[in-house]
């Protein structure tokens, strides 16, 4: 669909430019930001708007305050961190709308930046309430969506607001996300390899269905692999399995076989006698998982097998860890795959969420082509869905 970007606008000087960013970043108990990738990702768009002389109004959510004001979820730490990164003052608004906020916006000078308070402090945000969108817009002349990670949500600051502000465009982060996704799924250099992990098959079912029409190889790891293994007749001990999806898992593998898609599952795993970091654990083949033990990581032979599948890959998409990587004892498989993806002579795209964290924890984030900022949004794109936040930018359907 045709989308305009912020650098295609002729003049931003002195205009009130509303930029929807995603500063939903992790913080420690004292409110210190522990990981600021989403803030740094929005810097190019914010800097561009500043350089063009716009009056920059930023909006984001943080956490799940359930439609009520809660200081724990204030945007103050994000504004402070952004100030440090930009090397200039970012003012924190008193709220996200209202008379005081209107005065704060009207008092802004060219090139100044104002951070609105958490848009989820009001139920109208998640209800996609047009009235709330009107209040948020506050006379802004240009709307910029640079929040890919929330673009699968039809929320007021993502969707309804685009019917209020006259000029609607996307930012540079959004352009990067869409460009790399198109490179991976619409026009991939082959072979195209998809690596899927995580706990549940149910969360990736639609993705798997879609991938069956796109990929050359599929690699399945993480907890979801054991639903597939059980569907093949393996005894998987106490490993978590979605029994209701066993027939579906079998159908997916049959479909892959008929289409000539290589389908890889773990051949060994690390099993433990409890879901605990200190649990007794050992490596075993998938045929010999003891009764009562649960698999919490792929084993070294599986890591080698999965690494081999990437040797001739030209495009790699990875979403979902290979094990419970948050626990050191069960992180080796995920880190081995992270190293393999980082070393591949291919366009490598990491699908946000836990996979993003795993790649950073493995220390290879600088060696992959692109790390998506969106977990759920990335998955919905893989499923072939049109994201509400992206559809709202389509210039063909704009008023």
Swiss-Prot record:
Residue numbers binding substrate: 22-24, 38, 61-64, 120, 153
The record, for SUPFAM superfamilies, names: Phosphoglycerate kinase
Q: Which N-terminal stretch is annotated as signal sequence?
A: none
Name the positions where ATP binds. 204, 326, 352-355
MF (Gene Ontology): ADP binding; ATP binding; phosphoglycerate kinase activity
| Annotated catalysed reactions | (2R)-3-phosphoglycerate + ATP = (2R)-3-phospho-glyceroyl phosphate + ADP
Q: Which family does it belong to?
A: Belongs to the phosphoglycerate kinase family.
Concerning PANTHER family, the annotation shows: PHOSPHOGLYCERATE KINASE, PHOSPHOGLYCERATE KINASE 1, CHLOROPLASTIC-RELATED
Q: What is this protein called?
A: Phosphoglycerate kinase
């Amino acid at each position: 669909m045709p989308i305009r970007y912020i650098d295609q606008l002729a003049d931003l000087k002195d205009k009130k430019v509303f930029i929807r960013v995603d500063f939903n970043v992790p913080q420690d108990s004292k409110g210190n930001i522990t990981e600021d990738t989403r803030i740094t990702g929005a810097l190019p768009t914010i800097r561009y708007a500043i350089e063009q002389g716009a009056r920059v109004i930023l909006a984001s959510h943080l956490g799940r305050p359930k439609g009520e004001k809660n200081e724990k979820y204030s945007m103050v730490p994000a504004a402070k961190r952004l100030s440090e990164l930009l090397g200039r003052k970012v003012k924190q608004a008193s709220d996200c709308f209202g008379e005081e906020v209107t005065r704060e916006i009207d008092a802004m000078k060219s090139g100044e930046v104002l951070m609105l308070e958490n848009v989820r402090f009001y139920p109208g945000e998640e209800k996609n309430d047009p009235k709330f969108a009107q209040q948020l817009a506050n006379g802004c002349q240009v709307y910029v969506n640079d929040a890919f990670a929330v673009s699968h949500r039809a929320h007021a600051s993502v969707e309804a607001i685009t019917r209020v502000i006259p000029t609607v465009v996307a930012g540079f982060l959004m352009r990067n996300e869409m460009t790399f996704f198109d490179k991976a799924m619409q026009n991939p250099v082959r072979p195209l390899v998809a690596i899927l992990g995580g706990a549940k098959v149910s969360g990736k079912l639609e993705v798997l269905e879609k991938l069956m029409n796109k990929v050359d190889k599929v690699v399945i790891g993480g907890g979801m692999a054991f639903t597939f293994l059980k569907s093949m007749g393996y005894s998987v001990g106490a490993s978590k399995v979605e029994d209701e999806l066993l027939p579906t898992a079998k159908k997916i593998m049959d479909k892959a076989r008929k289409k000539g898609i290589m389908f890889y599952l773990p051949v060994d795993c690390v099993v433990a006698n409890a879901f605990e970091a200190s649990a007794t654990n050992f490596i075993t083949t998938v045929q010999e998982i003891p009764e009562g033990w649960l698999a919490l990581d792929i084993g070294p032979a599986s890591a080698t097998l999965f690494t081999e599948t990437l040797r001739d890959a030209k495009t790699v998409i990875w979403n979902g860890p290979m094990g419970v990587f948050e626990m050191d004892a069960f992180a080796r498989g995920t880190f081995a795959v992270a190293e393999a993806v980082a070393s591949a002579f291919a366009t490598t795209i990491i699908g946000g969420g836990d996979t993003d964290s795993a790649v950073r924890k493995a220390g290879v984030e600088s060696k992959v082509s692109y790390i998506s900022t969106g977990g759920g949004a990335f998955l919905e794109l893989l499923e072939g869905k049109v994201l509400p936040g992206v559809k709202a930018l389509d210039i063909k359907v704009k008023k």
